[in-house]
Amino acid sequence: MLIIPNRENLEQCVAFAKKHGLGFEYNDFFAPSLLDDAKRLEEVIQLYRQSGVPEYCTVHGAFFDVIPCSVDEKVKEISIQRIEASIEVAKRIGAKAVVFHTNYNPFLNSKEYVDKWVENNISFWSSELEKHSDIQIYLENMFDTTPDILEALSKSLCKYPNYGVCFDYAHAVISPTAPELWAKQLGRFVKHVHINDNDLVSDLHLAWGNGKINRKDFYALYEAYMPDASILIETSCIEDSKESFEQMKQEGFLTE
């Protein structure tokens, strides 16, 4: 189980993580402004290293407008720079994995476009997985309306031992496809899961139990299809992380 550390109350985050044996997923480094400020970037990396990096941690990579297979060469160039920078940060901080979004646009859905998109992304991510075989690279469903694209990618990329799917359950819930179908199609590829709550309409990142997601359904699907995957409580403040953690304990999903 992982939580998101917050620099504003880092000591509290570290204490809570140590008390319960939790890891961290660092969310600072997807910000373009930080990646572009070498001095500030180094300060943040050192802050986390000095605070005590948990034994298991991950980094959320850059995702704003990151399209590594764009037909626009300039967009492609900066996207690849962002991805490489994210991986470098993850390695420097001692993370076991780095998470990226598919960033697939579901409105471009002609067969020709989809086939080319899958082909190009398989080629790109295969290269990244080979180049960075010393770190896990996870692809997360974001704008995806079905698991089909991510499943197609995963069928080819799963031959790399450092590849996995990051299954964002809240994103799946607000998609037009039932969460059970997501779990069935992607389960065998899932190594990491993001959870938080919402109103079944928007991606609100509420504390677990403060929205309308059917939590029992999640527990059942997790146990059935991805029981070995790590889980991130993807909420932005330590209070919501604690509340979510306690909710899962009360419902018997977590034991200490």
What is the role of each PLM region?
Residues 1-85, 255-256:
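N-terminal pre-domain/capping segments
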Residues 1-5, 22-26, 55-60, 98-100, ...:
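Hydrophobic faces of well-ordered beta-strands that scaffold small-molecule active sites
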Residues 2-12, 28-43, 67-69, 106-108, ...:
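Acidic-and-aromatic substrate-binding clefts and catalytic sites of carbohydrate-active enzymes
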Residues 63-64, 99-107, 195-200:
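Short, basic/glycine-rich phosphate-binding loops at helix/coil junctions
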Residues 44-64, 119-132, 215-222, 227:
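Alpha-helix-loop-beta-strand connector modules within alpha/beta enzyme cores
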Residues 69-164:
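Active-site acidic/histidine proton-transfer and metal-coordination neighborhood
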Residues 11-18, 96, 149-164, 172-256:
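Histidine-acidic metal/acid-base catalytic patches
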